[in-house]
Amino acid sequence: MFWLRGGAQSCRGGETEDRMQRGMWGVGLARRRLSTSLSALPAAARDFVEEAVRLCRPREVLLCDGSEEEGKELLRGLQDDGVLHPLPKYDNCWLARTDPRDVARVESKTVLVTPEQSDAVPPPPPSGGPPQLGNWMSPNAFQAAVQERFPGCMAGRPLYVIPFSMGPPTSPLAKLGVQVTDSPYVVLSMRIMTRVGPAVLQRLDDDFVRCLHSVGRPLPLTEPLVSSWPCDRSPVLVAHIPSERRIVSFGSGYGGNSLLGKKCFALRIASRMAQQQGWLAEHMLILGVTSPSGEKRYMAAAFPSACGKTNLAMMTPSLPGWRIHCVGDDIAWMKFDDEGRLRAINPERGFFGVAPGTSSRTNPNAMATIARNTIFTNVGLRSDGGVYWDGLDEPTEPGVTYTSWLGKPWKHGDPEPCAHPNSRFCAPADQCPIMDPRWDDPEGVPIDAIIFGGRRPRGVPLVVEAFGWRHGVFMGSAMRSEATAAAEHKGGRLMHDPFAMRPFFGYNAGRYLEHWLSTGLRSNARLPRLFHVNWFLRDNEGRFVWPGFGHNARVLAWIFGRIQGRDTARPTPIGWVPKEGDLDLGGLPGVDYSQLFPMEKGFWEEECRQLREYYGENFGADLPRDVMAELEGLEERVRKM
């Protein structure tokens, strides 16, 4: 981190001099003077930083270099300020507790800024209800919002400059960004989640995504912080300006709102870039599947947040001889190569995973990954220096006590959970014991199957293969899932989530579907097969009918066979499903094929009715005709059941 002076408003008044001297979110880092200045940045990046300095008026500017020394200083400063707490049970692991109001993505305050509303979102719902596929803000309203929030918002704090790469810097699919922020927690997390360092600075030119973030709590404070966590929740704004490749975030320190390389850049901005440039930026995991014979295939899978992407990407298969390797657990950038193969990279270099439910039983590889160099946020704390959350099956010694994510004593049986349902771990990807040897390959890996999925407690079979590309795009557009804790929606409500991108579209969702349809028309494309899975079917007593976790390898093995052209499927009105006996259920007592593949006419009649209503309400005239034709085809097949 290089020391820069000038252009910043000094802090004055309010807090004690001692508090200011100690740093308050890392101000103390400014005492280390290094030789390099903003001259290390190209002119466009310098202009961006200087613009942010004039607007936000920070105390000083610090250019991040990604060094180990820099990381240690950030950790020391955050520990001194009470933001991070060491976890001595593990190696270089830390706990952060946020303000209880700052715990998830804020979809209602996340906007796309375009001159024309139709560029960002489909027509407003005819019913007058809230839009489901994104929020639009006019350029004039955006400028007013910036002027209401940002002038002087970093007073008394340092402004950190983070040049970063999404994807291996040498990859033809890599994209660069520069984030400025007043949060050292964000700097530490971005060092894990993206590629930061000299290799990025060497490649940085005028073509980069501009990311401005502030927690919105200038010094001196006018009211005390909660959990030493700065945020200003009432005027939160997460804005994306696709035409300028710019992201502006204010008021939240939570990762989904502040780590701007993640959903903001890698999905919202990148999906618009992908549409313009002929590739795909998707909310998908990437994994490699190796059969007992040694043949390997790569698959991508789109699930809504907290629906099992990380567990699937890091799965330990229950089938002997099968192996899984992880390329990425959340985001895939995919582009056809000159031979027509769809190649994918993971643009991230870390995991920002949901902690609750993660255990040595459900995901032993994740547990191994997070045992060192990890930042935990809003998990419970054990008196032996370990962490705790619902579903963690680690034994504890007698006498060990617990502190909840709210900093209060907690015991088993208490009505409130010890860890927040959306508590997170942030860990380097290369610590995962099953990372694929090609996970960092600049050329990417070839994708042979794309899988859609969500939480559907009834009616939707365990696995279905699309009849073809167009039908598969329809399946992706028709995805529905129970809401999770990853956003501010209440869990349990069944929500439409096309392609698991509902919160992440970077442009009009109808045109997004058109882009997917046109992808299938490429003359030389070797298109992946498309599937839909549902691990979450329940019986009439509410019990899961599929054991999930490592047994999901049985479904992947069937998909593997379909990629090879095996005749193991039978047609149904909704797609191809495994023939009875062709999905390996050996050693699963009580698992009933008929329960895994329900085909109820009444359910699908209602599903079609609700889907037609949803399309009309949320896509309107922007729904591609081919998608409506697929719905009409499904309705006709269901009528004949």
UniProtKB/Swiss-Prot annotation:
Cofactor annotation: Mn(2+)
Annotated EC: 4.1.1.32
Binding site for phosphoenolpyruvate: 105, 256, 422, 424
GO terms (BP aspect): cellular response to dexamethasone stimulus; cellular response to ethanol; cellular response to glucose stimulus; cellular response to insulin stimulus; egg-laying behavior; eggshell formation; embryo development ending in birth or egg hatching; embryonic organ morphogenesis
Tissue localization of expression: Present in liver and kidney.
Record's subcellular location: Mitochondrion
Alphabetized UniProt keyword annotations: Decarboxylase, Gluconeogenesis, GTP-binding, Lyase, Manganese, Metal-binding, Mitochondrion, Nucleotide-binding, Transit peptide
Residues given in the record as GDP binding sites: 306-311, 356, 455, 535, 544, 549, 552
InterPro entries named in the record: PEP_carboxykin_GTP_CS, PEP_carboxykinase_C, PEP_carboxykinase_GTP, PEP_carboxykinase_GTP_C, PEP_carboxykinase_GTP_N, PEP_carboxykinase_N
Entry's Gene Ontology cellular component terms: mitochondrial matrix; mitochondrion
Induction text: Appears to be constitutively expressed.
Cofactor binding notes: Binds 1 Mn(2+) ion per subunit.
Catalytic activity reported: oxaloacetate + GTP = phosphoenolpyruvate + GDP + CO2
UniProt: Mn(2+) binding residues: 263, 283, 307, 330
Pathway: Carbohydrate biosynthesis; gluconeogenesis
Family: Belongs to the phosphoenolpyruvate carboxykinase [GTP] family.
Name of the protein in question: Phosphoenolpyruvate carboxykinase [GTP], mitochondrial
Organism of derivation: Gallus gallus
